[in-house]
Swiss-Prot record:
Protein name: ATP-dependent protease ATPase subunit HslU
Biological processes per GO annotation: protein unfolding; proteolysis involved in protein catabolic process
Localization of this protein: Cytoplasm
UniProt xrefs under NCBIfam families: hslU, PRK05201.1
Length: 435
C-alpha cells in the first residue's frame, strides 16, 4: 500500500494523463483513505467503508487510464471489467461474482512476484549451483567447480548452451466446479498440484544458453522457497483490503424507458452488483473473500442514459460523482508532447530502430491537434484515441518506407500533416469511414 499524499498521487497521475484534475483528486483521496484506514484501531477500522466513485465523461478522456495508473501506483490488486459482459444469474453468460474471483487471481500473481523478489538472492545462489551442475556435472572436483564459477560470474560462459530441468508449468488438466458451489474449483489441476508437491513436481528438459537459463532457474528456486499457503492467505487479505474494481460501461446497463426485454436483464445485472458493492462474501478456490472494503470505481459516458437511470440503491453505493470534461485543442497538444510516453516520443523511438531520425515542428503538433479536434466534433467524439488514428495516417508512408531510408532525417511540419490528412478531414463523409 502506497504512503503517497493525495498531492503526490495527483502529480504522479499528471505524468501520464492530461487535465481531469477533479477525477484525479477524487481517486487520490480514495487511495489515501485506504492508508488512513490501516492506521486506525481494529475496532474502528472495520466500520470505515470505501467511498466508491462514479466517473461520468465521454470516451477517450482518461477514465480507464486514471484507474489503471492508480492501481499500478498503489501496487494493489486491480481488475477492469466491462459491465456489459455480465448477465443476471440464471441467464447464459458470466455472473458478477466472477469479478472477485478474477481479482483474487490478480492478487495471487502480485503476491507471488513480491515473495519471489524477497527470496531472489537465495534463489540466485541455488540457480548458480544448478548451472554449474549442468556445465561440469555433480561429480566434478571443488577446484573445477570454482574455476567454472569464476568464468560464469565473469560472463565468459554466457553464450554456451546447456540442458536444464525446469518445472513443467503446463502440466495438469483444468479443474471443474462443484455443482451448487460456484468458485469452489476443486479439480484435476488441484489434485495434480498435490501429487506434484508430494513427488517433487513434474519437470521438463530445456536446452538454452547459460545467460537465458537464469530466468527459469531463479523462478524455479524461488518457488521452492516460498509457501503457497502464505501467498494465498496474504493475497486474499490484500484483495479484501486494497483491491480496486473498475466497472466500465456502467451506463450501458442503466435501464431505459420501457422496461421490457433486454432492459429487464440489464436491471438484473445491477441488482446482482448491489451486494458486491455493498459488501458480501464470495466463494473462491482460495477461500471466502469479503468485498466490504474493495474500492469500486464505475464509469460511463451516459450519452443515451443518465446516472439517475441506475437503480437508486446502486446510485447510493456510488456516493462520489466526478465529471470528466471533453478534450480541447490545448489538451491534445499537451497529450502529444508532455505525457511520459507521448505518441510523438513513441513514434520517434520506433523509427530510431530503423536508424531514421523523425522530428516534429511546433506547427505540425498544432496541425495534428487541429485535425483531431475537427474530426471529434464533426464525426464522432472518441477523445484522445483520435490522435492515434491521425498519427497513423500521417506516418503511413514513412513507416512503410523506413527500412529503405535508413540514416535519413525527416522533419514533419504542418504542410506535411495537411497533405496527408487535410483532404480527408475536410470531407466529412469520407472521414466517417477512414479516420
Amino acid at each position: 500500500m502506497t504512503t503517497f499524499s493525495p498531492r503526490e498521487i495527483v502529480s504522479e497521475l499528471d505524468r501520464y494523463i492530461i487535465g481531469q484534475h477533479d477525477a484525479k483528486r477524487a481517486v487520490a483521496i480514495a487511495l489515501r483513505n485506504r492508508w488512513r484506514r490501516q492506521q486506525l484501531d481494529p475496532s474502528l477500522r472495520d466500520e470505515v467503508m470505501p467511498k466508491n466513485i462514479l466517473m461520468i465523461g465521454p470516451t477517450g478522456v482518461g477514465k480507464t487510464e486514471i484507474s489503471r495508473r492508480l492501481a499500478k501506483l498503489a501496487g494493489a490488486p486491480f481488475i477492469k471489467v466491462e459491465a456489459t459482459k455480465f448477465t443476471e444469474v440464471g441467464y447464459v453468460g458470466r455472473d458478477v461474482e466472477q469479478i472477485i474471483r478474477d481479482l483474487v487471481e490478480v492478487g495471487i500473481g502480485l503476491m507471488r512476484e513480491k515473495k519471489r523478489a524477497e527470496v531472489q538472492a537465495k534463489a540466485h545462489v541455488s540457480a548458480e549451483e544448478r548451472v554449474l551442475d549442468a556445465l561440469v556435472g555433480t561429480t566434478a572436483s571443488p577446484a573445477t567447480r570454482e574455476n567454472f564459477r569464476k568464468k560464469l560470474r565473469d560472463g565468459e560462459l554466457d553464450d554456451k548452451e546447456i540442458d536444464i530441468e525446469v518445472a513443467d508449468a503446463g502440466s495438469g488438466m483444468g479443474g471443474f466446479e462443484i455443482p451448487g458451489m460456484p468458485g469452489a474449483n476443486i479439480g484435476v489441476l488441484n489434485l495434480s498440484e498435490m501429487f506434484g508437491k508430494a513427488m517433487g513436481g513434474r519437470t521438463k528438459k530445456v536446452r538454452t544458453t547459460v545467460k537465458a537459463s537464469y530466468t527459469d532457474l531463479i523462478r524455479d528456486e524461488s518457488d521452492k522457497l516460498i509457501d503457497n499457503e502464505v501467498i494465498q492467505r496474504e493475497a486474499v487479505r490484500a484483495t479484501e483490503n486494497d483491491g480496486i474494481v473498475f466497472l466500465d460501461e456502467i451506463d450501458k446497463i442503466a435501464a431505459r424507458d420501457g422496461g421490457m426485454g433486454a432492459g429487464v436483464s440489464r436491471e438484473g445485472v445491477q441488482r446482482d452488483l448491489l451486494p458486491l458493492v455493498e459488501g458480501t462474501t464470495v466463494s473462491t478456490k482460495y477461500g471466502p473473500v469479503k468485498t466490504d472494503h474493495i474500492l469500486f470505481i464505475a464509469s460511463g459516458a451516459f450519452h443515451v442514459s443518465k446516472p439517475s437511470d441506475l437503480l437508486p440503491e446502486l446510485q447510493g453505493r456510488l456516493p462520489i460523482r466526478v465529471e470528466l470534461r471533453p478534450l480541447n485543442k490545448e489538451d491534445f497538444r499537451r497529450i502529444l508532447t508532455e505525457t511520459e510516453a507521448s505518441l510523438i516520443r513513441q513514434y520517434r523511438a520506433l523509427m530510431e530502430t530503423e536508424n531514421l531520425n523523425l522530428d516534429f515542428t511546433d506547427d505540425a503538433i498544432d496541425a495534428l491537434a487541429d485535425v483531431a479536434v475537427h474530426l471529434n466534433s464533426s464525426v464522432e467524439n472518441i477523445g484522445a484515441r483520435r490522435l492515434q488514428t491521425v498519427m497513423e495516417r500521417v506516418l503511413d508512408d514513412i513507416s512503410y518506407n523506413a527500412p529503405d531510408r535508413a540514416g535519413a532525417a525527416i522533419t514533419i511540419d504542418a504542410a506535411y500533416v495537411r497533405e496527408h490528412v487535410g483532404d480527408l478531414a475536410q470531407n466529412t463523409d469520407l472521414s466517417r469511414f477512414i479516420l
